[in-house]
Amino acid sequence: MKNWINEECNKEDIVINSNISLSRNLKEKPFSNKLNEIEARENVGFIYQIVKSELKDESCIYQLWNEDKELINSYLDKQLISKELIKNKDKTAFVLNSEETLSIMINEDDHLKLRCITAGFDLETAFDNITKLDDKIEKRVHYAFDENLGYLTTSPTNLGTGMRASVNIHLPALNFNDEISNFSKGLTQIGMDMKGLYEEGNKAYGNMYKISNQVTLGLTEEEIIDNLKGAVLNVISEEKKFREVLLTKCKYDIEDKVFRAYGILTSAILLSEKECTELLSSVRFGVELSLLDISKNKLNKLLVYTRDSSLQNYLKRKLSNKELNYERAKFVRAILAQN
């Protein structure tokens, strides 16, 4: 399975990665929010022993109460864990496979949240891998399940299959034409959700968006995936149409934006987190339009490792704001200079 950060993808592919999550609870235990600290940590140990024996490759557990903040947040940047897991760090943990494509969050909103993330637009591969692991675990434990409601979860929106499917997608042309809000409203009407991958004060930046299903009750896993695929394919089609319009009407402006961004990234001494993300979006746009020849795995690595927490975790030291901006620019220059 392809790690979305390291694997090379089609340069014209505007879907960054695909993600499938399954929420599960153990029948004999209270929900995670009802467990005290001792009970929650016992649950971590119990689940880890099961998961460890079912993962064929090497796995590693991270108990959040024992881990460095920047290390934890670096896995949030890689999209392997959730903000909800971090909020209850005295009770939570997560397990990763060696490829960092499978994550098992323990005591998040539910006892288990199984997540698989893979490169590009490939929901089927993510689904196949996560269901295989889920089936193995289900043979070892009793999941909380109701014949009418399906898998029982803390959130009513996860009842049924307990599955969330999502893709992260790059939409600079739709954003440029102020069409994001219209598409977001349209997706909501068909049971989908669309939000910015990176936000500052509830305002999205970087042209990266997450599209996911909102409801699982009454739908099969296959129906959820098919519905999401249909919605995403429509968004991709519209994004490409708007790109053609931009290249026809604003060719020089687009080229200037792309090459100006590349020039700044290859020469800047200081880069803030937000500015870097926005410039990387412009360069990614240039790659997708065949204006620049840069590998997607390079851009994905930069997207992740230029986040404040990931950069500090990579350098293994805490940095002031000025040091962060200096080291970020230095890191970007070094990666882009590689053959």
Swiss-Prot record:
InterPro entries the record matches: Arg_Kinase, ATP-guanido_PTrfase, ATP-guanido_PTrfase_cat, Gln_synth/guanido_kin_cat_dom
Top-tier EC class: transferase
Annotated positions binding ATP: 17-21, 164-168, 195-200
Catalytically driven reaction(s): L-arginyl-[protein] + ATP = N(omega)-phospho-L-arginyl-[protein] + ADP + H(+)
EC number: 2.7.14.1
A Pfam family annotated for this UniProt entry: ATP-gua_Ptrans
Molecular function GO terms recorded: ATP binding; creatine kinase activity; protein kinase activity
Alphabetical UniProt keywords: ATP-binding, Kinase, Nucleotide-binding, Transferase
Alphabetical GO biological process terms: phosphocreatine biosynthetic process
Phosphagen kinase C-terminal domain ranges (all copies): 14-242
Transmembrane segments: none
GO CC terms of this entry: extracellular space
Coiled-coil spans in chain: none
Family classification: Belongs to the ATP:guanido phosphotransferase family.
Function summary: Catalyzes the specific phosphorylation of arginine residues in proteins.
NCBIfam families: PRK01059.1-4
Protein name: Protein-arginine kinase
